[in-house]
From Swiss-Prot:
Organism placement in taxonomy: Bacteria, Pseudomonadati, Pseudomonadota, Gammaproteobacteria, Aeromonadales
Gene name of this polypeptide: rpsD
InterPro entries: Ribosomal_uS4, Ribosomal_uS4_bac-type, Ribosomal_uS4_CS, Ribosomal_uS4_N, S4_RNA-bd, S4_RNA-bd_sf
CDD domains the record matches: S4
A single GO BP: translation
Stored HAMAP family: Ribosomal_uS4_B
Gene3D superfamilies in alphabetical order: Ribosomal Protein S4 Delta 41, Chain A, domain 1, RNA-binding S4 domain
Matching Pfam families: Ribosomal_S4, S4
Protein name: Small ribosomal subunit protein uS4
Subunit structure, as described in the record: Part of the 30S ribosomal subunit. Contacts protein S5. The interaction surface between S4 and S5 is involved in control of translational fidelity.
Organism: Aeromonas hydrophila subsp. hydrophila (strain ATCC 7966 / DSM 30187 / BCRC 13018 / CCUG 14551 / JCM 1027 / KCTC 2358 / NCIMB 9240 / NCTC 8049)
């Protein structure tokens, strides 16, 4: 399945919630018709079956983190093999992706932009260039922008935008140095309450 490159707002409208795919600090406002699905006339949303609700939740989380279907299924399998709550394990694996950590630290305005920074070799982990967006970051890893990439206007702009967002407690960032540390894996209480990971577990458990 190819990665979606169309209008980001369509994905948020499809899921009926702001997926934070745009770079602004403000949530999507009413003029974007978040309560109607994409289409010429904004078709009315049909009542979903239990399976439909579970599928939509999976699609929502997959789109938030920008992960393809096969990748997402593999993350679920890895989460199920770990000890503890499978749903929480899944979210921690997604949060530990390098592109997501770069986004959380504010080096990229969106996860898509952060993925591009990683792919273009603008990011280092513990002093080494890593260009794999799915690379799993471990607690105490140090993430920084490469010296030659620090002049990029988009990174400076992203840090300014990030300064207006609520800062994640599981990362520490020195904006002046464009460097940060992944202090720990986020706990469930740290993450969005708008995600119901149990629905995803129920979907894949069938």
């Amino acid at each position: 399945m190819a990665r979606y490159i169309g209008p980001k707002l369509k994905l948020s409208r499809r899921e009926g919630t702001d997926l934070f795919l745009k770079s602004g600090v403000r949530a999507i406002d009413s003029k974007c018709k978040i309560d109607t699905v994409p289409g010429q006339h904004g078709a009315r949303k049909a009542r979903l079956s239990d399976y439909g609700v579970q599928l939509r939740e999976k699609q929502k989380v997959r789109r938030i983190y920008g992960v393809l279907e096969k990748q997402f299924r593999n993350y679920y399998r890895d989460a199920a093999r770990q000890k503890g709550n499978t749903g929480e394990n899944l979210l921690q694996l997604l949060e530990g992706r390098l592109d997501n950590v770069v986004y959380r630290m504010g080096f990229g305005a969106t996860r898509a932009e952060s993925r591009q920074l990683v792919s273009h070799k603008a990011i280092m982990v513990n002093g080494r260039v890593v260009n794999i967006p799915s690379f799993q970051v471990s607690p105490e890893d140090v993430i920084c922008v490469r010296e030659k990439a620090k002049k990029q206007a988009r990174i400076k702009a992203s840090l300014e935008v990030a300064g207006q967002r609520e800062k994640p407690t599981w990362v520490e960032v020195d904006a002046a140095k464009m460097e940060g540390a992944f202090k720990r894996l986020p706990e469930r209480s740290d993450l969005s309450a708008d995600i119901n990971e149990q629905l995803i577990v129920e979907l894949y458990s069938k």
